A protein has these predicted regions:
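Hydrophobic alpha-helical transmembrane segments of membrane proteins
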Residues: 1-74, 83-158
């Protein structure tokens, strides 16, 4: 278990080439849809867009995480040989990549929101993050890793 956790939680340079595009694609999609929603003056759509962007990032990271593990065989060999150990390692690795991508996506969206607010005050897309309470951000950053650790521990223990 210790070897699997250290293998999964280590932020390696190859992970960044996978996590950065996975994070920036939903950000660009969210920004374009937010600009389209802002032109139609639909405030309810602007509140839903951050959640849709986060869900899109998680799904994309799950798919790319499996592809990454299939192409990175040495990391896959560090997982337990049992079926439960492999599943736990896969869940932990995907959740780690998802957290990294969510942090990159949140930073990029806030930066794009600030740029949009400065240049296009009528289409203040950065204000769409205003609808999410402050306590949700730490939960979004920490909860996937904690769930992955607990899930990996339960699967390898029983």
């Amino acid at each position: 278990m210790k070897r699997m956790i250290s293998a999964c939680l280590r932020f390696e340079a190859p992970d960044l080439w996978l996590a950065v595009p996975a994070a920036l694609f939903p950000v660009l999609v969210s920004e374009v849809t937010a600009l389209m929603a802002a032109t139609e003056d639909d405030p309810e759509a602007l509140v839903l867009l951050p959640g849709v962007g986060m869900i899109l990032t998680v799904v994309l990271c799950c798919v790319l995480g499996v592809v990454y593990l299939c192409s990175n065989f040495p990391l896959l060999l560090q997982f337990s040989a049992s079926r439960r150990g492999s599943l736990a390692g896969l869940c932990l690795h995907i959740l780690r990549m998802t957290v990294l991508a969510e942090v990159i996506a949140a930073a990029a969206t806030m930066a794009l929101g600030a740029v949009n607010h400065g240049f296009f005050p009528r289409f203040a897309v950065g204000e769409l993050w205003r609808g999410i309470p402050v306590f949700v951000w730490p939960i979004c950053a920490v909860l996937p890793v904690l769930v992955g650790l607990v899930w990996a521990g339960v699967l390898t223990r029983f």
